């Protein structure tokens, strides 16, 4: 198996990397066309997305000898090591120099991008320019580098490696589950949606943690419950559902408006209902918990890119208000736990008013306008509050028209504490859903 075969997903990126490797291995075909191979490639992105494996795949496919340079020496010795690495590469050209985690060559400080190490790298790249030395670098934080280092001529290609999303996340999770004992009813698609946008390393850790849970429970296979528990533990840093000895959320208290656990349940159910009405299929996880000194819950959403950006923004604001509205609609009480939701809703709406001009261009703030004008700020804040009130009324309408869905979801949350997307969709299928337009 080649190293390119070991890269799961990322088909568009792999295609581009293979093309670059081909220019290095078969340069005579390109020379006949009068074109030259790129001099350098920089792969950048968050840690754990597979940059090092991709770099290794290019080296293998190119057929060239590689000289690796990574920060594993004191500063003075390391500068010397950089020069020696390029000297060896030029002696054995055609070759590749791999600058692994190049943003760590200096102090990793964004305030000091002109460190001696980077100056040395620039000088060495320029010296090797006509010596058939291809420079390959991996970087986590581009802001640590001087812009002159990654300009065209030094690195002709810059490729951002993003966290896996959609089918990429699905393929990677399937790969990590492939050689493990798993239950037949595992829905990999649900886990992929929960983990959408997380690094490959996080996906691998969740699958392995699920296996550890299964082993400790002496289970014959990894179940959906184990995977969901692993998501709670590794992704959301939430308390587990398995230890219920001090669980203070009870289905028996579901009609008691003064019970804090009940308010938590309806709060999270409100978020979920609003999201499912406005963006069907968007809820990936709903969780509630209340222990002696630890309480809360959350609803995780899948950001469906098929909706317009403005609709996604407005629906996020509506979802944020759903928890507060649910307790007001159900019990007529103010939800004291909704402060963060209100902050998020007002912050997003203020951005739409000030930076997107949704309430008129007279409220738009631009570079040379006096954004600190008291009158302008007062108008912007008034417009923001007015729009929030308008959406809040819509949210209460959604909950009122879909009361059956809200009640059944709250009932299920109070019993199970953790609901997957499949659980939510099953409950939803049993209810009459009334669409409401924002």
Please give the residue ranges for each predicted region.
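Activation segment
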Residues: 106-108, 146, 231, 273, ...
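Residue-level signature of catalytic and energy-coupling elements of molecular machines
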Residues: 17, 42, 59, 155, ...
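Walker A/P-loop NTP-binding motif of AAA+ ATPase domains
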Residues: 2-192
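Soluble catalytic regions of large protease machineries
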Residues: 46, 249-266, 272-438
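Short conserved motifs of the RecA-like P-loop NTPase core
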Residues: 105-107, 182-198, 209, 224-226, ...
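AAA+ ATPase "lid" subdomain C-terminal helix
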Residues: 193-240, 259, 272-284, 353-359, ...
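Active-site phosphate-binding and catalytic loops of NTP-dependent enzymes
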Residues: 25-33, 131-132, 240-242, 277-286, ...
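Non-catalytic accessory segments flanking P-loop/AAA+ NTPase cores
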Residues: 1, 6-12, 46, 54-56, ...
